[in-house]
Amino acid sequence: MENIEKLLMQEKILMLELDLVKAKISLARANGSSQQGELSLHRETPEKEEAVHSALATFTPTQVKAIPEQTAPGKESTNPLMASILPKDMNSVQTEIRLKRPSDFLRPYQGISIPQKSELNSTVTLHGVESGIQHPHINYYVVYNGPHAGIYDDWGCTKAATNGVPGVAQKKFATITEARAAADAYTTSQQTDRLNFIPKGEAQLKPKSFAKALTSPSKQKAHWLTLGTKRPSSDPAPKEISFAPEITMDDFLYLYDLGRKFDGEGDDTMFTTDNEKISLFNFRKNADPQMVREAYAAGLIKTIYPSNNLQEIKYLPKKVKDAVKRFRTNCIKNTEKDIFLKIRSTIPVWTIQGLLHKPRQVIEIGVSKKVVPTESKAMESKIQIEDLTELAVKTGEQFIQSLLRLNDKKKIFVNMVEHDTLVYSKNIKDTVSEDQRAIETFQQRVISGNLLGFHCPAICHFIERTVEKEGGTYKCHHCDKGKAIIQDASTDSGPKDGPPPTRSIVEKEDVPTTSSKQVD
């Protein structure tokens, strides 16, 4: 990789030297023509001198009169009423056949243009970036194998090309040169055809299923009025979509495996926080907005460090974006300071019919200091479809703990509250009663055994233990109903050779399937 960069640098330097040599050649030619013009001037000078001497020879002393005495102070000058014949007033007699025009003496180069100085700066040519100007950062993705192998410049196309393909390998690069070098090295080692560069608009990737095609938003064509209305110079901004395509289990498993296998090489826009069962994404500046949106929908984000223009979160829900904008403009004095979004979320839950539960989020906004990314490690991914419920229970317990910790914070400002999302920030003043009621209402609506979209006895047991430590009480209608059924079944006069069918079912559901150990 370093040899390629050195060769490219040498190529640019040689091109600059070639331009310099061309400029020297043009200047040498121009100097040669100027010397010829000077020789022609020297040839004409004796003729002028002869004409001047002949005019002086015809002068007689009687024709010269003295200048009148000046009565006013000042420099003496010739009388404008007296005719004066001086050498400068004599017209030169030209004996050559070709007439010399004054313009010929003013243009010694005879129409040869002087080479202009090159305006290119060596620093700009070599580096390609002007100081003080920020250019949009474009990442490149190499899909090494599979039916859609190639080099992409869009994360969405890359995900569509690799999602659901077994054994596919892909990697992210910061420049097209690095991506091309890696792709060529792979194809050379595998003795396969060279991978093509596939821009965003030319990627022909069909939806994976008919259901995905139905849920994908169609492109709307702009209809312009042609009678008396002038067409605007630019297309109108896209309207806010009231719904987004639901995340599928395949999408979640793809992002889950991507986070587990990410080792931090080749991408400085994100890093992962790795635990025993799950890896969460931490997105930095210039991260792919589409990937941020998908990871947000999957509940796999821990922190976001957006740019000043908030381009990384432009695809998040509109109310969340508006809350972040209001925080930047109203809650901090220096609007140019970096901020962070710390997210605690559950993960989706699916059934045979489809998506059952969308993630719930508690988001904290604050002013960010220097970001020190943790080292991303490639972790082993052994999760199966049947393990997703257990993982959802663990993330649900962690979500409840984070939500209950808000009771210990006395200075909180609620930026936004929705049915499944709470956005808050720290405040210099004590929490007002309105914000306190909003937090309590959100806690009462979310903290229950139905947190994951279905009644989970393990969640109920965790809530009960947590609330008892705080000195409170918690009761679940479903769990109390199950206990009543168990008690009634124990007093039933049924057969004594075995438990009733309802007893075994209820006891199996009532046993917690996970521990209360916190998973960061």
From Swiss-Prot:
Domain of life: Viruses
Entry annotated with the keyword Metal-binding: no
Cysteines engaged in disulfide bonds, as pairs: none
Annotated GO CC locations: host cell cytoplasm
Keywords: Host cytoplasm, Translation regulation
Cell compartment(s), UniProt: Host cytoplasm
Keyword Manganese part of the UniProt annotation: no
Stated family: Belongs to the caulimoviridae viroplasmin family.
Name used for this protein in its record: Transactivator/viroplasmin protein
Species of the source: Cauliflower mosaic virus (strain D4)
